[in-house]
Regions:
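Short, solvent-exposed turn/loop segments enriched in Gly/Ser/Thr/Pro and often Arg
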Residues: 13, 152, 199
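Extended, non-catalytic scaffold segments that flank or surround catalytic motifs
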Residues: 81, 175-178, 201
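Acidic/histidine-enriched, glycine/proline-rich intrinsically disordered or flexible terminal extensions
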Residues: 199-210
């Protein structure tokens, strides 16, 4: 359980793609003096239920503020710690980024629960993930797709790409190569390595050890 002396506490599961995304944003922002209250899969927390009526993770607590939607959390962190900015200033670009993030949240993130389900459900989710990522990668140019600066869009996509090998999701060679090169640059960032839970690090132990 996190120390009460910390000004910020993040309730997080060690194999939750949403929690990973929030931890990555916090590490990219260099947030100091925050604690992680780890919950294992299936573990419930009375403290969390008192704070969050949905009893969901990630949940961020900063003094009297409790935030429990991952998108709201990362946008709050981006505004609370303005440097480096993780969203463009231009309102049109911001809208485009938000739409891209929304599509990942709606289309890709929910598939991870199915990937942990029965073999039949997991196979269907794997095929759907492959289909969606192949479409994304078909015209993929990282700097065209995500802009010139590292952003919340990268932070949303990185936890997805990290889990593909673990869940045996493969893409056609041409599209897979494009995403793999981009993913390697994401995974090489020091903040990404720091964002990994022990469970997540074991998904790709050789890469996490580098």
């Amino acid at each position: 359980m996190a120390s009460r002396r910390s000004s910020m506490t993040l309730y997080s599961r060690d194999n939750c793609v949403h929690s990973h995304r929030v931890r990555l944003v916090m590490e990219e922002k260099g947030v100091a003096n925050y604690e992680i209250a780890w919950l294992r899969d299936g573990e419930e927390s009375e403290d969390l239920l008192d704070l969050n009526p949905y009893n969901s993770v990630p949940t961020l607590v900063e003094r009297e503020l409790v935030v429990y939607d991952p998108r709201i959390i990362v946008e709050y962190i981006d505004e609370r710690y303005p440097h480096p900015p993780l969203m463009p200033v231009d309102p049109v670009l911001r809208a485009q980024y938000r739409l891209a993030i929304y599509r990942m949240e709606c289309d890709l993130y929910p598939l991870f629960e199915d990937l942990e389900s029965t073999p039949a459900v997991a196979r269907k989710a794997r095929n759907r993930m492959t289909e969606l990522l192949t479409t994304l990668a078909a015209d993929f140019s990282p700097r065209q797709y995500i802009g010139e600066e590292f952003s919340l869009l990268d932070c949303t996509l990185a936890p997805i790409l990290w889990r593909l090998e673990h869940h045996e999701v493969t893409l056609p060679s041409k599209q897979g190569e494009r995403l793999a090169k981009y993913a390697a640059r994401l995974f090489a960032r020091p903040a990404f390595e720091r964002s990994l839970s022990p469970v997540e690090a074991e998904m790709r132990p050789a890469m996490a050890a580098n």
